[in-house]
């Protein structure tokens, strides 16, 4: 991948080159509505950018370096690295503050004896629709990838136990999600990690349903969420043909 990028940079140094992660982050950026979400995207983008800085410097070095001198590429690489490290540190520091605030909120809920439910699932599976139905809220529902980036918390009353329960809607997952993205969004995903119950929303009309269920379950394993907490919620049953419904039943 980096060899191909170097060829592009050598021909047109100012050209923008995106890989799969860049594309995902570009979509994320369109849906970021809070400072925390924006910082998480920036951190993931910088983590993905880091390995490329050396390659960019090598291209510039071949273009402007001379024998026995420090090439212009080497100088630029050092400058880019320093700038990259400073940005990374700033983003991590700000996210650490957000994570601390979120932990205080979760600890406060626990001290009050409030139980929590987290809604997870593959992107565009219908998590926010379920959240709206359960909480009677009207958060934006889109037929789009990654429409939810932030963790939104609401509450529902459970007559059977006579208590209110908190419920959170979280970011949608995707196959082959890079570890850097999971790490960057860790503070948001903490709502799921500390939840008493995790509702795994599944689009039952999706031909790739089985594979996507496996993707979500794998990410939950990475987050060390016990399987005992996970409950499947099948969505979009109305979009399944009658014959398929018979097979499912």
What is each PLM-predicted segment?
Residues 1-116:
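Conserved P-loop NTPase architecture
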Residues 169:
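Conserved active-site aspartate in kinases
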Residues 84, 130, 149:
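Conserved hydrophobic/aromatic pocket- or pore-lining residues that grip, position, or stack substrates
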Residues 25, 173-174:
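A short, flexible beta-alpha/helix-coil linker loop
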Residues 1-16, 158-164, 185-249:
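Conserved C-terminal guanine-recognition region of P-loop GTPase G domains, centered on the G4
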Residues 102, 109-115, 134-166, 174-187, ...:
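Switch I (effector-binding) loop of TRAFAC-class P-loop GTPase G-domains
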Residues 122-140:
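A conserved segment at the C-terminal end of the G1
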């Amino acid at each position: 991948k980096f060899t191909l990028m170097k060829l592009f940079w050598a021909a047109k140094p100012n050209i923008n080159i995106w890989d799969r992660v860049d594309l995902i982050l570009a979509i994320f950026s369109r849906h970021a509505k809070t400072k925390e979400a924006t910082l998480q995207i920036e951190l993931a983008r910088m983590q993905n950018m880091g390995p490329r800085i050396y390659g960019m410097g090598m291209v510039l070095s071949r273009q402007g370096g001379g024998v026995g001198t420090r090439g212009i590429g080497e100088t630029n690489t050092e400058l880019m690295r320093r700038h990259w490290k400073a940005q990374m540190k700033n983003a991590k520091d700000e996210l650490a503050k957000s994570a601390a605030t979120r932990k205080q909120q979760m600890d406060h809920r626990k001290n009050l004896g409030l139980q929590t439910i987290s809604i997870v699932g593959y992107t565009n599976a219908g998590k926010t629709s379920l959240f709206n139905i359960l909480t009677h809220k009207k958060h934006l529902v889109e037929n789009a990838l990654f429409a939810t980036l932030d963790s939104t918390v609401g509450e529902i009353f459970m007559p059977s136990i006579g208590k209110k329960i908190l419920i959170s809607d979280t970011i949608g997952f995707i196959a082959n999600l890079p570890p850097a993205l999971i790490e960057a969004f860790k503070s948001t995903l903490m709502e799921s990690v500390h939840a008493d119950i995790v509702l795994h929303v599944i689009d039952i009309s999706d031909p790739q349903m089985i594979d996507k269920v496996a993707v979500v379950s794998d990410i939950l394993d990475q987050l060390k969420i016990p399987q005992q907490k996970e409950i499947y919620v099948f969505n979009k049953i109305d979009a399944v043909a009658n014959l398929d419904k018979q097979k499912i039943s």
